[in-house]
Amino acid sequence: MGARCRSFSALLLLLQVSSWLCQQPESESDSCRPGFSSEVYTFLVPERHLERGHILGRVKFEGCTGRPRTAFFSEDSRFKVSTDGVITVKRHLKLHKLETSFLVHAWDSSYRKLSTKVTLKSLGHHHHRHHHRDPVSESNPELLTFPSFHQGLRRQKRDWVIPPINCPENQKGEFPQRLVQIKSNRDKETTVFYSITGPGADKPPVGVFIIERETGWLKVTQPLDREAIDKYLLYSHAVSSNGEAVEDPMEIVVTVTDQNDNRPEFIQEVFEGSVAEGALPGTSVMQVSATDADDDINTYNAAIAYTILSQDPELPHKNMFTVNRDTGVISVVTSGLDRESYPTYTLVVQAADLQGEGLSTTAKAVITVKDINDNAPIFNPSTYQGQVLENEVGARIATLKVTDDDAPNTPAWNAVYTVVNDPDHQFTVITDPKTNEGILKTAKGLDFEAKQQYILHVTVENEEPFEGSLVPSTATVTVDVVDVNEAPIFVPAEKRVEVPEDFGVGLEIASYTAREPDTFMEQKITYRIWRDTANWLEINPETGVISTRAEMDREDSEHVKNSTYTALIIATDDGSPIATGTGTLLLVLSDVNDNAPIPEPRNMQFCQRNPKPHVITILDPDLPPNTSPFTAELTHGASVNWTIEYNDAEQESLILQPRKDLEIGEYKINLKLSDNQNKDQVTTLEVHVCDCEGTVNNCMKAISLEAGLQVPAILGILGGILALLILILLLLLFLRRRTVVKEPLLPPDDDTRDNVYYYDEEGGGEEDQDFDLSQLHRGLDARPEVIRNDVAPTLMSMPQYRPRPANPDEIGNFIDENLKAADSDPTAPPYDSLLVFDYEGSGSEAASLSSLNSSESDQDQDYDYLNEWGNRFKKLADMYGGGEED
């Protein structure tokens, strides 16, 4: 272990620094002065070619920061300065001069930049490399001593930095193994005990390094792993037997040197790249990359070299690609890449450390050959024919088919069609994104009367320009135009006519006609108005002459916009099918002074006390000069209580206010307004004077209705209506409570008649010679009034009954006429009501009551003649004509 862990050059450097410190006066050691130990450092290099990681030497800097490490900066980016001052080569380089100089910077505790110059001197090629002894990394010193001072035991003002101790990782053998012995110069004066502190000693990982207490031998207790910890910073201590420090702590840096124990690892298992077909040799395709956990600065253990092991397919050449040994960039080395033949290549790439001589690993690189436009699309077939109806836009004419050997759905495959001989851009070709076919359509309507057939030449290319000298393919398309009945066309499509608004009724405004585009057809055109919202116009269907049918009004805001009235006229031909064209008639109505000015508002409220004036705006729908300036005047005595004055110089508004305090109530103000052309009008303003002061907020005016009636009049009207309703209710109540006195149909048994006698015995003749004809009226005139209360009464005329005649001979006619009146009487009692007749009349066929049963034949018992008297006597006939008794 001792031979591999020694560094004679480091020991020499330590002794030189120690000697220099011993020669310094005491005054300089008392204060810390920041700066480099030398203004110029000169390092000898064996040859001009320097490999990466080569150690040149070390610079020393005191920053007075109390920290053992310092950040350095090299102005030459080819060199790296670590925090311990060691200068190494960052990458392979060649020194073109015998001397190369650069500056190294560092900063002190006050952030002041300090610099030193580093010079490299080349010894030339005759000095072989193994004759050069590296001052830092060759071996470790066998003995390290604490610095000594002239004046006894004192704590030094600056840290004591020694060269690092190198120890290889993964050491085999028995442990612990000695690294270096630490010795104090005062071990002859007193017994000295040694100890170490820091990570790896008394801090995690604890126990990696130990020191023999009496001898000062620093030992390592286990194999080291540089990939885990590449450097240990320890502090050695020397104390006397009584525990007093005899030396200041000394920094010990143990650097773990690398062994090639890690193989390279690709950052990806499969790398993907692409290159255009036909790429020239030297074209970069992609880059593969691998990493190695070993030391890539001081050793070649992580120096990776790349090679291609295999290529699949090995066509058209075995080695189509090459890889840069150092960078891993894969490039084309042979021409002949053709996507249509070999679209992909798979390479097996190896990465090996020790510049290709050490551990290795492999990965795949998949290279896709990108398509270029080296194949032109070809029409198949190259001639087409189609037809289209005239005036149709976007009509499909033909489908153009092409073939292209390039990769589908790429710019080199996507077809772009162009109609060569189409100067008016009447046609267009749209590419179907799925099939790559070209759809030929009309971009504008075609006119059969202008041209009946088109012969088009269509070329096809790709979105991506052609590679090389490819020629676009051309197809010929014959298009036949089919004639259709076209609608008449108004000339112009929008006709503007200016007329005064008082143009009159029945007068001709203009002639608006359309032309027939179908010149090969003889068709008749008729006209009619399609839209005339105000019904002002009429048109001659044969000639297209438009006339007025009603008075026009420019101020009609519903139908007139910006003094323009719009009407739509249609023209219809008699073709098959019928076609209709539309034209627009714009009537610009010039203004006439047909409107007098009016005030706004017309209803106002004033306070009775200290009233605020009101502003009245004058409105006139006419146009200048038939409007302002306006003239205003109070008429019909309104100026007695009110005053007006103009509110502006244009006289377009007025100020109205009362002349004096007025009573609360309503006032009518007649205001005459005239425009600039003396068109005037008198308008009545309604003004309410309220019980308030100043500005009207809540108008307290006399209680009145808007109709103008006073309260007493309203109360009188309501009282009359109420009295009439009460009278009607009383009348109805009286009618319902009226009592009807009915006379009995038959007289009581004890009723004594003067001329009627009763006979209780048979035989003899009738003695009643005297009779009273007034009794015949009991069934008609003296009948009780019958009123139905189950239905609403109907209004109808009462039947007229004939009065009793004075002549007894007319009694028959009297009965017949009154019988008919009774039959038509709706208020008559039911048919089965009992009627009493006290007088039988003269000439009775019955000589006596005793002879009723003495009839000798059925003729005598026939009562059918009673049916001739009406329904009322039918019951009587049924009662007495039922047949003979048993």
UniProtKB/Swiss-Prot annotation:
One of its GO terms (molecular function) is cadherin binding. PROSITE patterns: CADHERIN_1 (PS00232), CADHERIN_2 (PS50268). It comes from the Eukaryota. The modification Phosphotyrosine is found at residues 757-759. InterPro entries: Cadherin, Cadherin-like_dom, Cadherin-like_sf, Cadherin_CS, Cadherin_pro_dom, Cadherin_Y-type_LIR, Catenin-bd_sf. Gene3D superfamilies: Cadherins, TCF3-CBD (Catenin binding domain). GO terms for cellular component: actin cytoskeleton; adherens junction; apical junction complex; apical part of cell; axon; axon terminus; basolateral plasma membrane; catenin complex. During apoptosis or with calcium influx, cleaved by a membrane-bound metalloproteinase (ADAM10), PS1/gamma-secretase and caspase-3. Processing by the metalloproteinase, induced by calcium influx, causes disruption of cell-cell adhesion and the subsequent release of beta-catenin into the cytoplasm. The residual membrane-tethered cleavage product is rapidly degraded via an intracellular proteolytic pathway. Cleavage by caspase-3 releases the cytoplasmic tail resulting in disintegration of the actin microfilament system. N-glycosylation at Asn-641 is essential for expression, folding and trafficking. Addition of bisecting N-acetylglucosamine by MGAT3 modulates its cell membrane location. Residues 1-23 form the signal peptide. It is found in: Cell junction, Adherens junction; Cell membrane; Endosome; Golgi apparatus, trans-Golgi network. Homodimer; disulfide-linked. Component of an E-cadherin/ catenin adhesion complex composed of at least E-cadherin/CDH1, beta-catenin/CTNNB1 or gamma-catenin/JUP, and potentially alpha-catenin/CTNNA1; the complex is located to adherens junctions. Found in a complex composed of CDH1, RAP1A and PKP3; PKP3 acts as a scaffold protein within the complex, the complex is required for CDH1 localization to mature desmosome cell junctions. Interacts with the TRPV4 and CTNNB1 complex. Interacts with CTNND1. This is Cadherin-1.
